[in-house]
């Protein structure tokens, strides 16, 4: 029987790892970084809407920036994908994961007083 080659990025095992890491990043950012979700942008959109309706402008900023950073992360991943030539040594997915790791490693050193920056960068990494 002939075995069909499967893209590693489409494996169930990697899907489980990504779901777990996304959940961890949400738990970390919500519990440790001022009640903002890193990965669950629907939750941030809900909290953003509530903050707008209450005219609580500091909270609007707190939820808006991570949502925009997540969108920027998606655009950055697309930019990497489109700019990468197939003949390069690294695949665009590998470069994207490397960018995520660099950003998340940097977030570890951001103090709690800069939660808006930390949450925005974490959301950027989740968007990649």
Q: Where are the model-predicted features located?
A:
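Alpha-helical transmembrane segments of multi-pass membrane proteins
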Residues: 2-128
């Amino acid at each position: 029987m002939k075995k069909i080659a499967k893209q590693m990025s489409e494996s169930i095992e990697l899907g489980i790892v990504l779901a777990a890491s996304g959940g961890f990043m949400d738990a970390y950012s919500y519990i440790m970084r001022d009640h903002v979700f890193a990965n669950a942008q629907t939750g941030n959109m809900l909290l953003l809407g509530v903050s707008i309706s209450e005219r609580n402008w500091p909270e609007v900023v707190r939820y808006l920036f991570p949502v925009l950073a997540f969108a920027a992360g998606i655009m950055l991943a697309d930019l990497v994908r489109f700019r990468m030539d197939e003949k390069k040594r690294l695949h665009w997915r590998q470069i994207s994961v490397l960018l995520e790791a660099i950003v998340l490693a940097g977030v570890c050193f951001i103090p709690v007083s800069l939660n808006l920056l930390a949450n925005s960068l974490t959301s950027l990494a989740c968007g990649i």
